[in-house]
Structure formats: C-alpha cells, structure tokens
Amino acid sequence: MPKTKIAVACQGGGSQTAFTAGALKALCQAQGQGRLKDEFEFVSISGTSGGAVCATLLWYSFMKGERPVWQRMMNFWEENTAQGPVEHAINRFIVESVRMVNSGMMPTLQLSPSSPVMQSMMEFMTAGQRMGFSDFRGLLEKHIDFAEIASWGPQPKPPVLMLGAANVTSGALAKFVSTQEAIRVEHVLASCAVPNIFPAVQIGADAYWDGLFSDNPPVEELIRPRSVGEAHIPDEIWLIKINPTASRRVPVKPGEIVDRRNQLEGNISLFQQLGHLEFMNDLILADAFRPEFLSRFDIKAPVRIPKSFHSDADKPYHIPCIEMPVEFQDLLDYEGKIDRGSENISKLTAEGEKAAAVFLRERAAAVAASSLNEDQTAGQAKSRGEVPDGLPLARWKDPS
C-alpha cells in the first residue's frame, strides 16, 4: 500500500515556534513508532522565520539519515534558550522593556538595527555570553553544516525544503527551495530578519526581510511541480499554526492591540493560500481537469488541507491543523515571541507535543469520515447503474 505523501508547513512566530519544534518531534515519533493507522512520508517541509529554523534543522537531519531525526532540532532549541541567572536577567530585561513600550508605559526609541548605537547596545548586553545566546548566525552554523549542504548542491530527493522571505527592494515573495539551490545560512537568516530587530540580509544583489511579509508559511507552492517535483505532490498539507485565527475579546489596551495586529498580519498570506487551494480542490471535484493531467502528477483526489476559519462549511478534503488550545493562547502575548526564558520555551515545546497528538487523532477521524462518504457515494452510484470514473476522486462527490 503506497504511503500518504505529507507536506508540513511551519508558520513563523519567533520564540513561540518552540511549539513547532515540539509538534514536529511528536509527528516524527509517531511516524517512527508506527503509531499511525496509515503510514506516511514527508515529501516537503516549508517554513518562515522561526518556522524556517525548525524546518531547516529537521530537513538537514532527514538528509543525513539521522535517528532520531528530531534530536538536532531539539538540541538547537535547548542551546537557544536562556541559561543561568545572567542570561535570564538579560532576557527578562529585553522582554519587559518591549512590553512596557507596547503598553505605552515607556517611550519608543526608534533605532535601526544597522545603526552603530543599536549594535553597540547589543554587544554590551551580550558581552561574555554564550554564542548560543548572543550569536544567532553562529548558533545556526553550529547545528547545521552549511558547507556540507553546499557540497550536495540542489537536492532532488525528498523531503523538499522551502523557506519564505521577502525581497525588500522589488517586493517579490521569495522562496528558497532545496531542489533549486543549495540552502545557505543566509537563506535562513533572511527568513528570520524581522526589520526592527535584524538588518536586511544581503544575498547577491538583493536584500531580504522576514517571511512574514511574503508567505507565512509557504503553502500553495508545496503543490507546484516546478518547486517540489512531479513525484512529490502531497496528498495532505499539515499546517503547524502559531498565530490564532480568532480572538475572544476586542483588544483595547495598547499591548493587546499590538498583539492582535501581529496575529492578523501573520495570517493574511496563509488564508489567501488556503483559499486558492480550496478553489483548486473544488475544481478537481467538479471534473474541471482532464484525467490524464491529474494522472501525470499522481493526483488521485483533492489535497487535504485545513480550513481557514472554523465557521467555514465542512468539505470532504478538510483536515484539522496543529494549533495551540485557546486556553494556552490566552496566556501568550506579542512579547512572548522574543522570550527565550527556559520556562516559556519548555511550556511551548510541551504544548506542541500535546497539540500534535490531538491533531493525529482528529486527522484520523476526519480521514475515516471522508473515506466512509467515498464508499457510500460509490455504492449509490453502483446501485444506480452508473459507470464509475477511472480516478478515485470520482468517489469524493457528495451524495445527491
């Protein structure tokens, strides 16, 4: 029986993507321990910002054939977490300073991350600290051998890695894809370059900012043969979501407004991409594509994707996404995305593992329900004397 092809898309969110690391760990453990009813394989992994870091670390371990495949990623997060009283004090100072600015209790000091003043301030605050705490590029290079990746060149075999960033000058939505070029540390840094924290990352003649301004995360491109290859079109896209879709209250305080605005901005491109995929899925169900075209890309049915909004009508190809429970979301704020305190990181990682377990159960139920509908529809067609289509997707039609 062929394995279910899975694309995993990891949304950005700074330190809160420790949740993503926990979720990816749980997914890999479930795959390796055979605890899923149907076997699956990761054919592609995409990510933006902190999601790009998690995706790259996991992809690198896959490429090297490491076991457990998630260990390198978790080692990175352990070293990226504040350690000892001095680092925790620096971390608290940064987080609380930003919180006071966002709440209106402290005036905003607008400094460019490229300015000598800002660079001197950061050097002073992190002087004598571990590289893992003070040197993001150095930390990435410690856990990923980019020289080794360069020696590989473009990698056609799965999983395909795709990182999102934004071209500052042209405005183009940039994607760095492992099938097209060797992944560089600059690609990861570009995807993480939040403008008010990091300077734009120069790659060749172009400069890049955080992927929040492009695809957060890349989703639509995961089904395009030009990016992932004809053999790696996924059957399902598993989304690890950081920014909540809904809010239980209208933000009134300055800090609440900053937080909700950041969440909405982080979801705009995601919902647009999911909307495009829904439209494509509906066209497939309407027989808008020739069977030979679908067969060329091994498309037997619509790609399973999550809804954009919980209030959207249910469709046979919908599956849940991996997201934080509402009660946990209520405890977080914008400043938590820069909080590298050990308590914050460990809670996020643990919540990610639990959310992945919930997702696997709910996904299995959704797939089983749609399969039951397929069988019922096929049985009704047979009883009416209809000749079934040669493709399995004909059985996805809602019974009428």
What would you call each of these model-derived segments?
Residues 1-48, 53-400:
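Patatin-like phospholipase
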